[in-house]
A protein has these predicted regions:
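Long, contiguous binding/interaction regions
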Residues: 1-121
């Protein structure tokens, strides 16, 4: 038997407004890529998003990632329209996000791994 382990990963998307095109999304993704953020600019239907895997969410979590996307997007004349947490995050990661930003960032206690484990018991 072989068992592998990795640190937690948070899948997170920033959807851009209707003015944004795929070139904008790809430019933003390239600009924010780092050892902590894997990012792609994607076309989903008729909208574009910056799709991210936050591989060190205790260093760069949804709050920091969305801020980076917003800064680069604004320089290109587009805006982040909404944010999307894909799956769950840990309470440790959630605790680093200011309470007043959580709704905008699509995060809440009921979207944590710990909450889901608790309600199953």
């Amino acid at each position: 038997v072989c068992v592998g382990a990795r640190d937690q990963l948070v899948a997170y998307n920033c959807w851009l407004d209707e003015r944004a095109g795929i070139d904008d999304a790809r430019h933003i993704a390239r600009a924010i890529r780092s050892t902590e953020i894997r990012a792609l600019g994607l076309m989903v239907g008729d909208r574009v998003q910056v799709s991210m895997n936050l591989v060190s969410p205790m260093v760069v979590g949804p709050f920091e990632a969305e801020r980076l996307v917003t800064e680069v997007a604004e320089r290109r004349g587009v805006m982040v329209e909404r944010n999307e947490l894909v799956g769950l995050l840990s309470r440790d990661v959630l605790s680093r996000i200011p309470t007043e930003s959580r709704r905008r960032l699509d995060v809440a206690d009921d979207r944590t791994i710990e909450y889901r484990v608790e309600i199953r018991q």
